[in-house]
Curated annotation (Swiss-Prot):
It comes from the Bacteria. InterPro entries: IGPD_sf, ImidazoleglycerolP_deHydtase, ImidazoleglycerP_deHydtase_CS, Ribosomal_Su5_D2-typ_SF. GO terms for cellular component: cytoplasm. Its EC number is 4.2.1.19. Gene3D superfamilies: Imidazole glycerol phosphate dehydratase, domain 1 (3.30.230.40). HAMAP family: HisB. Pathway: Amino-acid biosynthesis; L-histidine biosynthesis; L-histidine from 5-phospho-alpha-D-ribose 1-diphosphate: step 6/9. PANTHER family: IMIDAZOLEGLYCEROL-PHOSPHATE DEHYDRATASE (PTHR23133:SF2), IMIDAZOLEGLYCEROL-PHOSPHATE DEHYDRATASE HIS7 (PTHR23133). It is found in: Cytoplasm. One of its GO terms (molecular function) is imidazoleglycerol-phosphate dehydratase activity. Belongs to the imidazoleglycerol-phosphate dehydratase family. This is Imidazoleglycerol-phosphate dehydratase. Keywords: Amino-acid biosynthesis, Cytoplasm, Histidine biosynthesis, Lyase.
Length: 197
């Protein structure tokens, strides 16, 4: 079986980003992005997805975090698409419900080749510490567009905004883990009646 690893760099006038990931890792995360709360969330992807994820970013955070957050999502999406390859033998679909105290979120993903984000998180605060909660949409939209996935994200309940988004990222990691798992019954087959994704 081929290694499912990828390294992608993205350089613009706003950000310089490097992402390395291993889809068959142990859940190790290394982050140096200048956006600490996003690093905390990406660590949930690594740990709950059993994905080794190394992300570095130098961005124009003296303006705000928008460019860094969006471009990190884009670059992780590009690395994901590269590591997944032609999708032969994977389960394709993944889903997870994750609670954290009063908060509960559901994430459903399809490695369909068709980018789509449907996201409903009724945040109880506009900021978590210094982090603008609107930027989570930018992160996931960047990821979806470049990974070529359909992603449904719903926070079903929650009072604490930190708990709300942490359950989302944990569920995202777990849904990735399920969707990317190799199914021995599929062998080298494409998980689609069309024969292609």
């Amino acid at each position: 079986m081929a290694d499912r690893k990828a390294q992608v760099s993205r350089d613009t006038l706003e950000t310089q980003i490097s992402v390395e990931l291993n889809l068959d890792g142990t859940g190790t995360g290394k982050f140096n992005t200048g956006v600490p709360f996003l690093e905390h969330m990406m660590d949930q992807i690594a740990r709950h997805g059993f994905i080794d994820l190394d992300v570095t970013c130098k961005g124009d955070t003296y303006i705000d975090d928008h460019h860094s957050v969006e471009d990190i999502g884009i670059t992780i999406g590009q690395a994901m698409a590269k590591a997944v390859g032609d999708k032969r033998g994977i389960r394709r679909y993944g889903h997870a419900y994750v609670p954290l105290d009063e908060a509960l979120s559901r994430v459903v993903i399809d490695f369909s080749g068709r980018p789509g984000l449907i996201m409903n998180i009724p945040f109880t605060q506009k900021r978590i510490g210094k982090f603008d909660t609107e930027l989570f949409w930018e992160f996931f939209q960047g990821f979806v567009n470049h990974a070529g996935v359909t992603l449904h994200v719903d926070c079903l309940r929650g009072e604490n905004a930190h708990h709300q988004i942490e359950t989302v990222f944990k569920a995202f990691g777990r849904s990735l883990r399920m969707a990317l798992e190799r199914d021995e019954r599929l062998g080298d087959a494409m998980p689609s009646t069309k024969g292609t994704l």
